[in-house]
Amino acid sequence: MAGFSGKKHIVSALMRRYTDRVPVTILIGPYCSRLTKYSVKEILQDAKKSTEAHLAFYDRFAPDSVIIYNDIYLEVEALGCELEFPENDISHPRTVLLDEKSRLARLKVPDPKRDGRIPYFIEVCERVSAQVRKTTALGLGHSGPWNIAMHLR
């Protein structure tokens, strides 16, 4: 299967078609920062630095897919939860957003164009995709409803 790109390996496997090897992907998360001069904190707050770190990971390991998954607290931050950003570890909530049940009714649906770091995450996805989408499958990760509910309390 000469000339088979990582993307073709992933798509073939998902469609249950022949591929000459098992596709490989690695969920590295924010620790791709270690392949650059940036700290985890920097790539969690700067789309250009995060893009550079994800592309450094792609260039070094050539996975069949790149998964952009920086932070499990992205959604709760957009809802108003204040986060702490250690220099070389993932962020975590500084306070509990729903310390009182009555606050639940006051939550607003976040605007992905302006709330929290959702605009940053969209920018990272667009920047990385522009560089690798022709040869590599691209995925992204985010928290689902149960994780979000747990992180709010």
Task: Report each predicted region and the residues it spans.
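Active-site-proximal, glycine-rich beta->alpha crossover segments in alpha/beta enzymes
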Residues: 80-153
